[in-house]
Swiss-Prot record:
Membrane topology, record value: Single-pass membrane protein
Name the UniProt record assigns to this protein: Type II secretion system core protein G
Upper lineage: Bacteria, Pseudomonadati, Pseudomonadota, Gammaproteobacteria, Enterobacterales
Propeptide feature: residues: 1-8
Modified residues (N-methylphenylalanine): 9
Length: 142
């Protein structure tokens, strides 16, 4: 009778592969997390630039920006709160308001504390006035 040789991996070989995979994961995961943060910030920057452009169109039509009370909603529906818009396009200035990457709404302060208007995301923590806020006044700083 012929003895069949068993094929397979030894426990030591499996452990070596697991250790190598762990080392690779420890190198790759931090890089992926950093890229996610950069991508989230870039989305906020793009959204704020788009909102600024829409607000500039609103100002061209109405000689002023929407008030804080009217908010960014004034870009998709005609404000019902005074001062009323003199001219308002049938479809508004944008189709919908974007949300920041963390599911929060962008905020408008008009007149702003940093310029004519302040547009900002409350950041990952969702709390306005904290260090992670990203606003149109911080775009060139970070």
């Amino acid at each position: 009778m012929r003895r069949q040789s068993q094929r397979g991996f030894t426990l030591l070989e499996i452990m070596v592969v697991i250790v190598i995979m762990g080392i690779l994961a420890s190198l790759v995961v931090p890089n992926l997390m950093g890229n996610k943060d950069k991508a989230d910030r870039q989305k906020v920057v793009s959204d704020i630039v788009a909102l600024e452009s829409a607000l500039d169109m609103y100002k061209l039509d109405n000689s002023r920006y929407p008030t804080t009370e009217q908010g960014l909603q004034a870009l998709i529906t005609k404000p019902s709160v005074p001062p009323e818009a003199r001219y308002y396009p049938q479809d508004g200035y944008i189709r919908r308001l974007p949300q920041d990457p963390w599911g929060g709404d962008y905020q408008l302060v008009s007149p702003g504390q940093h310029g004519q208007i302040d547009i900002f995301s409350s950041g990952q923590d969702g709390v306005p006035g904290t260090d992670d806020d990203i606003g149109n006044w911080t775009l060139s700083k970070k």
